[in-house]
């Protein structure tokens, strides 16, 4: 009697697991994460031959600001560069190796520039 209950609980637990979103790992390619419908996402190429994550963040920030200047309501966007997620918003750019994981400050706003967190003037 206990075995079927344990088996049923295990099946329910496995059914609730969903694969986590993985960022593309292509070298030198900057991506924007687009959401088509609830639960449907894909990565759009923003730029190729991007030398580093800072340049990708700058490209994504430029795209974010252009969207806002055209009347867009979403102040936060997500991108990816070489297997890392980039989360951009009014506070700056945060990075993580997983979509749902801890996000670490990467670049912050200082005036109209993005700078490393320790370089920003108070």
Regions found by a protein language model. Give the residues of each.
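Sec-dependent bacterial lipoprotein signal peptides
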Residues: 1-18
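Mitochondrial intermembrane space
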Residues: 18-122
């Amino acid at each position: 009697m206990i075995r079927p209950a344990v088996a049923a609980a295990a099946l329910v637990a496995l059914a609730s697991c969903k694969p986590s979103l993985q960022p593309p790992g292509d070298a030198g390619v900057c991506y924007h994460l687009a959401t088509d419908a609830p639960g449907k996402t894909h990565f759009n190429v923003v730029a190729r031959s991007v030398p580093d994550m800072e340049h990708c963040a700058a490209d994504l920030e430029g795209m974010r600001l252009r969207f806002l200047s055209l009347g867009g309501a979403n102040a936060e966007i997500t991108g990816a560069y070489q297997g890392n997620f980039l989360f951009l918003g009014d506070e700056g750019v945060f990075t993580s190796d997983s979509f749902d994981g801890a996000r670490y400050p990467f670049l912050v706003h200082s005036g109209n520039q993005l700078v490393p967190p320790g370089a920003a003037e108070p």
